[in-house]
Amino acid sequence: MKPFKLSLAAALALAVSSACAAPVVGPADDSFFTNPAPTALTGPNGDLLSYRVATVNLGAGATAVNAWNVIYKSTDSRDRNVAVSGTVLVPKAAWTGTGARPTVIYAVGTHGLASGCAPSKQLALGTDYETANIKAALAKGYAVVVSDYRGALAGATSTYLAGKAQGNAVIDSFRAAASVPNSGISLSAPAGIWGYSQGGQTAAFAAEQLSTYAPELKIVGVAAGGIPGDFFKTADYLNGSIGFAFLGSAIVGLGNQYPGQLPINLLANDEGKAALEKISTQCVFQALFENQNTNIAQYTRNGITLEELLAVESVNVTLDAQTLGRGNISVPMYQYHGQADEFIPLDQAVGLKKAYCAKSTKVKFDLYPSEHIVTQFQAAPTVLTWLADRFAGKTADSTCNTTAADPKPTANPGGGDFIVSLKSWPLNAAVGLKTLGQTVLLPATSTFTADANVTAQTLRGNLNVPDFKQTLKIIGLPIQVGLKIVPAGETTGSVSVDNAGQLKIRGTSPVDITVTSVLGIPFGECKTVSPVQFPLSFDGPISSLGNGALNFSGTTSFPLIKGCFISAILSGLMSGSGQTYSLTVSPPAPVKF
């Protein structure tokens, strides 16, 4: 019997080897992103089909990485075998923490339905709008795995917002990454899943599926923000709003995943079919800007309303299949949402938290003060700290037992312009006085309030600086000077976001500067004879709105100071050209719920 056992073992090994053939090195050109034949999809989920060394552009200051593009086997929401692409990023520097290097499985948000919008292609070009979050994870020394989801390969179609398929895709991206030669990624090392918006939905679906789809993986925590967990409420929220493109994209993506269940050709009119076809060719920002405030009744035969569409049984069943909160999550969860989110309704996110808490999931929920895009990037430091604690094996805290009332949304009304409201955002500011060679730090309680209207491309707001005292060295002596900085008019300018997610701001903030006292002696109206103009100029990724990188700096001129008997002295010390300034604006801190 012994020889038979050896033969059986050999046969089993041969079977496994045949089912999971060695991955091939793919071509260097775009033909790499070709959908493999169905016969290649016979291995286990996460089977690495092909890979290649990749070049990525993460921008200035990024951690040096080794990178690979991968194509791997996964399953979609109908349990069919599919091929999915992605990118694997591993810092070149050795991991200096305890144990093996952890991995962040990064689930991207909406990128657009066209294959050219895929993260793998955007990371190569240096145009991926989520680069800031990926860079932040790499800076911690973590490996980062990014799935493109279904649809980036030639011959494949996007299954946008098909939750089960997306959850499977990110889980299998981690499995595939561990098979990349010399990646150093280990399936036995701790890993965390992080996603926002579409990525938040993906992360939550992956978490619900872990115990059955990937019980062998050491996933220690899931961070999911801006989650569309209730598609019925989310669809109603998006319809007729600035975020209609997400609803239109969902119709296309779910129609691809569930052909026949969303009878688009039967329900859409010619205008609707053309609009959905165009959305299929666009990346996220172009689709967003070109489809604002559309009502789905414009695109349906006989003006069928959203409510009537959702009553169609096959449509209802399809959307219901994307509902979260019904599965158990066995790992800690960090959930977060923007109180002013204009795309994903807050109440259904709160409901999802309660559903998970009721199933004994350990959920920590943070409420961020701003809108959807800002929150995505503002939350990154907190997410990474939370994940670091999970990787370190620390006990996760929970806000499931909060007695606080449900938070109320503060989003700008739907159906209007796309406005990012900066309500009393902390202002970290400094002014450099050229003649004195010294820097004046504005009070830590200074704030900036503005409405950045991306639709109208206008910026309107004001600085708020409390009166303060600053010690300056004058002729070598430390002298305390009282200062008042007040708006001399509204901060005005222009703001725009291009199709690549690049933010551009141009404007001016005029202020009057008054010297209120010297050595404690009050001087009344000893102020600049005309307003000081602080030019506001910024060019950078839209992530800067949330991650603290929104900075306006440069040089300006201070007019003469008049109104008191030492005006001439103060003018000599503080007036003239070449004065420098730095104004950094960041959103307020979140609150627990």
Predicted regions and their residues:
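Accessory cap/linker subdomain of secreted extracellular hydrolases
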Residues: 37-38, 228-326
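C-terminal catalytic histidine-bearing segment of alpha/beta-hydrolase fold enzymes
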Residues: 316-317, 334, 343, 350-419
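Catalytic-loop region of hydrolases
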Residues: 21-99
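Short beta-strand/loop motif that positions the catalytic acidic residue
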Residues: 193, 329, 334-341
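Extracytosolic secretory-pathway proteins
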Residues: 409-593
